[in-house]
Amino acid sequence: MASNTTYGDWMRPIAGGIRNIGRPLTLAGLGVLVVTLMLSMVNVVAAIVTAAVGIGAITVLAIRDREHRNVLDRTVERRTWLAESRKGRALYRSGMLAPVESGQCRLPGILSKVSLVEANDGFGERFTLVRHGHTGEYSLPFACQPQGAGLADDDVEDAYVASWAGLLEALGSEAGVTQLAVTVDTSPDSGVRFRRNLTRRTVADAPELAARAMAQIMDLYASGGASSSVVLTLTFRYVDARTGRFLEPDDAARRIGQLVPGLIRRIADAGGGTARMLTIDEISRMVRVAYDPAAQDTLERDGERPWIAWEDAGPVACETGWDHYRHDSGVSRTWEMCDPPKSNVTSSTLTRLLGPLADCDRKRVTVIFHILPPDRTAFMAEQNRQRAANQVSQERRASIGAMSQVNKANRQAIETNRGAVIVFFGLLVTATVRAGEGEAIRLDAATHAVEGAAGSARIDLRPCYGAQDSAFAASLPLGLNLRNYTPPSVFNQLS
C-alpha cells in the first residue's frame, strides 16, 4: 500500500532582476536606457530607434517556453548540433575495422576518458571505482535490492523516506561528494537464467509426472517476464589542498573506502536492502548490454559467463541524431525533466514510470541529486526568499503563481534555518528498442509509452535534442556529472 503522506514545495532557483528576467537581461536593459538618454541629447530619432531595438531584443530573450528556453537557446542548440554533424562528430566507429590502431571497442564521447580502478574498503573488501579522466572525479556504484513499499505499512514507508532524507543531508555535510544518482533499469527477461536454474534442480531419475510438470513450467514462464536492477552511484571530487591537483586513485580510494560501511548502513535504512559494490566485470557487462541490447541473450546463454574487458564494453558503431541515438543493435531516445510536478505527490507517483513498459525493449530511469553544502544552502534559501518577495512587489496585482513562490521560499528558508539542506534534482529517461525493420514505429510507440507514464506522474519531459549521445551516457549508472562538462558562461556568473 502507498502512504498518504505528500511531498512537494520544490521550486526552481529564481532568476532575480526586473520581473525575474535575470540579472544579465536587467543589466542590458539599464544599458539600453543609458544609451538612449545619451543619444536623445544628440539625435531623438536615433534614440527612439535604439530604444525600440534594444527593448525588443530584451523582450524576445526574456520570453521562455515551457521548457525554459528562449529563442537564443534554441538557435544555439540547433546550430551547434548541425556544426558538429558536418564535422563528422555524430559518427563513431571502433573495433577491428575502425580507423584506430588499438582495435578495441572503447566507449565514445564523454565516456572516452572513463576507466575502472580497484581498491579496498575499510573492511578490506575489494570494490571498484569509476574514474572520470575529464573531470578528475571518482564514482562508486552500489547494486541495491529495494524492499519496496507494496507490503509496507504507512509508518514504515514514511521511515524509509525520512532515512533517505537523512542520507542526503549526511552527504551534503561530507566534503568531496558532488552527486548522487539512482538508476532503475528494466528489460525483458530472456528466460535463459530461469531455464538454467530449473535445469540445475532437475535430476535425471525424476518421476515422469514431475519432469513433465517442470518442462511445462519452463515453457510457460520462461519468457514474458521483466527484470529490474537498481544501482545507486555516488560521485566524489577530491583536490589536494597543497598542490591544487586532483587526488590520485590510491589516495581517493582510501578516502572513499572509509565511507563505505556507513553508506551501506544508511542505504539499508532507506529501504535499499543490502547494498553491495559492483565488480569490474559487472560494470563492464552492464555498459556492454546498454550499448548492445542483443548481447544480453548471448551473455546469459553462455554457461561460463565470458569475461568482458572494460576496453571492449563500448559499441562497435553509433550515430547521434537530432532526437535519437543509434548504437549497435539498439535505437534509443532520452528525455530530461523540465519541471517537477506542479502539486504535491505521494511516494507512489513514479511507480508507472519506473516499472516495465510493454512498448520499450529496455528502459532506464536515472534520478540525479546535487546536494548543496550547508554554507551555500542558507545563502541560496535567503536569496530565493528575497527574489520571490521582490517579484510580488513589482506586480501591481500579485498573481497566484507569484504568491505561491513566496510561500514556498519562506517555508524553504525556515526549514534550512532548522538544519535542512537544499537538493537540486533532475531526471533522465532512456527508452531503447531493437534496431532493424520497423524501428521508427517501435521508437514512436516507446515514446508514447514513456510520455504517457511521465504524464501520470505529472512530470514534464523533453527530449534531449542535439545531445542524445551525452544524455544516454549520463543516464548510465557511471556517475557522470554533467555540470562539470558545461562550458562556463558569463551570464551564469552574473545571475
Task: Walk through the language-model features, giving the residues of each.
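Extended, folded cores of ATP/NTP-driven motor/assembly subunits in large transport
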Residues: 2-7, 11-24, 46-495
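Membrane-interfacial hairpin junctions
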Residues: 35-49
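Hydrophobic, membrane-inserted alpha-helices
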Residues: 28-38, 54-58
